[in-house]
């Protein structure tokens, strides 16, 4: 059994900004949400500055970096403009993701194999700047191995297909996707990569995946913002932290 590391919770506050932007103005404030999440136990804050600025804005990233006490994870497409902005903000970490304007949310993992020549310079620039790079990828061996070759310190495994299969009550696909995640986490750790996971996670799936000892960080947003409408963001963060701790305890007890 691989030794377990502490499991961090990164709270994605994008959809606080989605609500704000529905009417314009400054409320609800994503930075206030980030501070609330941290007070409730979040280990870091994730925000995605999309090229179309549909939720998070440039000023949000600058304020988050200046005002929060925990690490900022800057999600972004690996475009020259976004690389320039991120280097200016100097977050603790960046997560490179695929991005299409017509999508409602990030729909798949980054094609590191196909885009290795364009990704390599960006990864190198962030490494040189002391900004931790993670690549948001499917649990595919070729993608994981290429991430290691490009000297990305970390990957974030895309858990969306697994979570969708659970929602759609497709047990065979659930089992298949879970096997891919388990194998991918083990391969990534053996390749020297720090392993994160995210997309579509809720209390139950976060508790399940927390039992994988290789995974050291979960980034969760949409579900938590939805739950916060009913019980408040602070209570939602505490409940998610508890779910993760229950899952992690199964590793410790094993």
Curated annotation (Swiss-Prot):
Q: Which Pfam families match?
A: PdxJ
For 1-deoxy-D-xylulose 5-phosphate, which residues are the binding ones?
A: 14-15, 50, 55, 105
- Catalytic positions? 48, 75, 199
The record, for Gene3D superfamilies, names:
Aldolase class I
Q: Kindly report the protein's main subcellular placement as a broad class.
A: cytoplasm
State which Enzyme Commission number(s) the record gives.
Answer: 2.6.99.2
Annotated site (Transition state stabilizer)? 156
Q: List the disulfide bonds.
A: none
* Entry's family note: Belongs to the PNP synthase family.
What is the recorded name of this protein?
A: Pyridoxine 5'-phosphate synthase
């Amino acid at each position: 059994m691989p030794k377990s590391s502490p499991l961090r919770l990164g709270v994605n506050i994008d959809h606080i900004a989605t609500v704000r932007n529905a009417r314009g103005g400054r409320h609800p404030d994503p930075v206030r949400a980030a501070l609330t999440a941290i007070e409730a136990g979040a280990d870091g804050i994730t925000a995605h500055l999309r090229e179309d600025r549909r939720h998070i804005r440039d000023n949000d990233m600058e304020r988050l970096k200046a005002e929060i006490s925990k690490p900022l994870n800057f999600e972004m497409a690996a475009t020259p403009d976004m690389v320039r902005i991120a280097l200016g903000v100097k977050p603790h970490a960046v997560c490179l993701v695929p991005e299409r304007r017509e999508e409602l949310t990030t729909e798949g993992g980054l094609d590191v194999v196909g885009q290795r020549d364009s990704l390599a310079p960006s990864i190198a620039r962030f490494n040189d700047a002391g900004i931790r790079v993670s690549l948001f990828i499917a649990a595919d061996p070729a993608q994981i191995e290429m991430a290691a070759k490009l000297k990305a310190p970390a990957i974030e495994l895309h858990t969306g297909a697994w979570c969708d299969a659970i929602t759609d009550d497709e047990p065979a696909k659930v089992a298949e996707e879970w096997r891919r995640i388990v194998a991918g986490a083990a391969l990534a750790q053996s390749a020297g990569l720090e392993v994160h996971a995210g997309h579509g996670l809720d209390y139950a799936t976060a508790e399940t995946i927390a039992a994988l000892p290789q995974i050291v960080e979960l980034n969760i947003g949409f579900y938590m913002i939805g739950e916060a409408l009913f019980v408040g963001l602070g209570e939602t963060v505490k409940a998610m932290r508890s779910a993760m701790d229950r899952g992690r305890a199964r590793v410790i007890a094993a």
